[in-house]
C-alpha cells in the first residue's frame, strides 16, 4: 500500500538561523503526525546543519540536485556518494527550473536517476508540461516522453522505491494550480503508462503533485486516488503552512 510523501523544496532560500528556526518549528508542528512521509530539501550548503537539526525526528533529509559523476574535475558539482555520506535520502532531479535554466535534457536526467538508484538513494523525478504544451493538448505526450527516458534505459523496475512528482510548469510559482480533477487525470495517466510495463511497480510508485500546492488547496488535491502527497515550494518555507499540507495528506489517506 502506498503512503503519501510531502517534501519541501526550499530552492535557493535559507540561512544558518533560518534552518534551525524552521526545522525546530516543523518538529513541533509535526511531532504527532503519522501516516505520511515527510522530507525537506535545503540548499546543499545547509545539508549538514539540517541533518543535525533533524536528528531524532521522522523528517527525512533530501537534496535538490545531483551530478552524474562520482568524483573528479567537475567544479561546483555534488555527487550521489557525497549526498549519501551526509545523510540525504530523497534527491530531486528533473525539476523544471533545472530543465529551463540549466538546459537539462531527458537523457541527462535519466542518467542522474540511474546514478541515484545505484547509490541507494531515492530519486524524486519531476516531470510536467509548459503552458504552451498544456494549451496544445500535449500534456500526456510530454509526461510520457519524460518517463520513457527512464523506462527505455532502465526498465519499469527502476521506479520501484522511487518517487515521481508531476509539476505542471504553468502552475509553479504562478499561483495557478491544476484542479484536483485535472491533476488526478494526469497522475492516473502516469501510473497507467508505467503499468504497461509493470503493473505491480506502477501500483506502488509514489506520484506527488507539485504545482503551487499550499495550505488552502492541499486537502482537496489529496482526496484524489492517484495523488500521493506533494512536492512543495514556497509553502515549505513556512512551518505552519507546510504542516497543514502534511496533515492533510495524512488525513486523506486514512479516510
Curated annotation (Swiss-Prot):
SUPFAM superfamilies assigned:
Triosephosphate isomerase (TIM)
Keyword vocabulary terms for this entry = Cytoplasm, Gluconeogenesis, Glycolysis, Isomerase
- Can you cite a GO biological process for this protein? glycerol catabolic process
Residues bound to substrate: 9-11, 173, 212, 233-234
Keyword Zinc-finger in the entry? The reply is: no
Q: What is this protein called?
A: Triosephosphate isomerase
The pathway noted for it is: Carbohydrate biosynthesis; gluconeogenesis; Carbohydrate degradation; glycolysis; D-glyceraldehyde 3-phosphate from glycerone phosphate: step 1/1
Q: Which residues form the active site?
A: 95, 167
Q: What class of enzyme is it?
A: isomerase
Reaction equations catalysed: D-glyceraldehyde 3-phosphate = dihydroxyacetone phosphate
Q: What is its EC number?
A: 5.3.1.1
InterPro entries with a match to the protein in the record: Aldolase_TIM, TIM_sf, TrioseP_Isoase_bac/euk, Triosephosphate_isomerase, Triosephosphate_isomerase_AS
User: What is the recorded function of this protein according to its Swiss-Prot or TrEMBL entry?
Assistant: Involved in the gluconeogenesis. Catalyzes stereospecifically the conversion of dihydroxyacetone phosphate (DHAP) to D-glyceraldehyde-3-phosphate (G3P).
Give the chief site where it resides. cytoplasm
Subunit comment: Homodimer.
Species of origin reads Serratia proteamaculans (strain 568)
Enumerate the subcellular locations listed in this protein's record, separating them with semicolons: Cytoplasm
Pfam families, per the entry: TIM
GO molecular function, one example? triose-phosphate isomerase activity
Q: What Gene Ontology cellular component terms go with this record?
A: cytosol
